[in-house]
From Swiss-Prot:
GO biological process: fatty acid biosynthetic process; phospholipid biosynthetic process
Localization terms from the record: Cytoplasm
The entry's keywords: Cytoplasm, Lipid biosynthesis, Lipid metabolism, Phospholipid biosynthesis, Phospholipid metabolism, Transferase
Family according to the record: Belongs to the PlsX family.
Enzyme class: transferase
Statement: the UniProt record of this protein carries the keyword Chaperone: no
Gene Ontology cellular-component annotations: cytoplasm
Pathway of action: Lipid metabolism; phospholipid metabolism
Organism: Staphylococcus aureus (strain JH9)
NCBIfam families named among the record's database cross-references: plsX
Protein name as it appears in the record: Phosphate acyltransferase
Length: 328
């Protein structure tokens, strides 16, 4: 049985989409128990595997992260993290304030001994539909080569345990594919990755080929990773808008759009990384999953499923035994 703590109040569309996703999750997964934290006035579920705990406070999207977790000790997000810290829950899921969630992850759930910097990881779409693991996308703006090596080790475990990929191919994001390309960070990181024979490091990868499906894990610093992620999000939205405008521009195009409706929907689904779940803060003593702030019920359900798989695969213990112990 996997037990997850969930923030009912976090996100733009909470609590409605959270409640809908939780209800579907406990119906679909018979080995799942939920601890739900939020306002009792807005709780309306009744299921034997859902335990509700009232919280009198909520961390808002605009709250300053560290100050919020210190001042709002009875908030749904803080109480959720405390449940993971105490061992009551195997992991947690929230669509709330990203900075606050990273703060409760670091200061309440806690970092695995030997992990220098936790990393925020997402799974992004590829042309062939299989996707790739991408980290760090914003946990740490600055990074050292040793941190990128550790990100690769964490990403390797994540790709194996969560995505079911044997011997995943690992690449370093750079401005060229040649080993000598890049700045001091990427050059030294390349050396370290190449020397770690426990990893299937296949070299550098350029941003323009990220979605080609040639690799399984891509490693970069949080500053670069966050910009790449937001660029991909923006590009996908722009392409969608351009397609819509083109289809609506004439009767002929509208007819073509009606014929291609199913194919266009499939394309949109393939480009939507929320299909793969939320982003995960790797390197902590428990699984911490961040669903997108504007998640609908389907996306939040995917984040719950992702956290459940992490619990089933005992990913935290694997990270302790490999990355943690090797760096103590």
């Amino acid at each position: 049985m996997v037990k997850l703590a969930i923030d009912m109040m976090g996100g733009d569309n909470a609590p409605d989409i959270v409640l809908e996703a939780v209800q579907k999750a406990v119906e679909d997964f018979k080995n799942l128990e939920i601890m739900l934290f939020g306002d009792e006035k807005k709780y309306n579920l009744n299921h034997e595997r859902i335990e509700f705990r009232h919280c009198s406070e909520k961390i808002e999207m605009e709250d300053e992260p560290v100050r919020a977790i210190k001042r709002k000790k009875d908030s749904s997000m803080v109480k959720m993290a405390e449940a993971v810290k105490s061992g009551e829950a195997d992991g947690c899921v929230s669509a709330g304030n990203t900075g606050a969630l990273m703060s409760v992850g670091l200061f309440i759930v806690g970092r695995i001994k030997g992990v220098a910097r936790p990393a925020l990881v997402v799974t992004l779409p590829t042309i062939d539909g299989k996707g790739f693991v991408f980290l760090d996308v914003g946990a740490n703006a600055d990074a050292k080569p040793e941190h990128l090596l550790q990100y690769a080790q964490l990403g390797d475990i994540y790709a194996q345990k969560i995505r079911g990929i044997d011997n995943p191919k690992i690449s370093l994001l750079n401005i060229g594919t040649e080993p000598a390309k890049g700045n001091s960070l990427t050059k030294k990181s390349f050396e370290l990755l190449n020397q770690d024979h426990s990893l299937n490091f296949v070299g550098n990868i350029e941003a323009k080929t990220l979605m080609d499906g040639d690799t399984d894990v891509v490693v970069t610093d949080g500053y670069t990773g966050n910009m790449v992620l937001k660029n991909l999000e923006g590009t996908a939205k722009s392409i969608g808008k351009m397609l819509k405008d083109t289809i609506m521009s004439s009767t002929k195009n509208k007819l073509a759009g009606a014929i291609l409706k199913k194919d266009l929907a499939e394309f949109a689904k393939k480009m939507d990384y929320s299909e793969y779940g939320g982003s995960v803060l790797l390197g902590l003593e428990g699984t911490v999953v961040k669903a997108h702030g504007s998640s609908n019920a389907k996306a939040f359900y995917s984040a719950i499923r992702q956290a459940k798989i992490a619990g089933e695969q005992n990913i935290v213990q694997t990270m302790k035994e490999t990355v943690g112990e090797s760096n103590e």
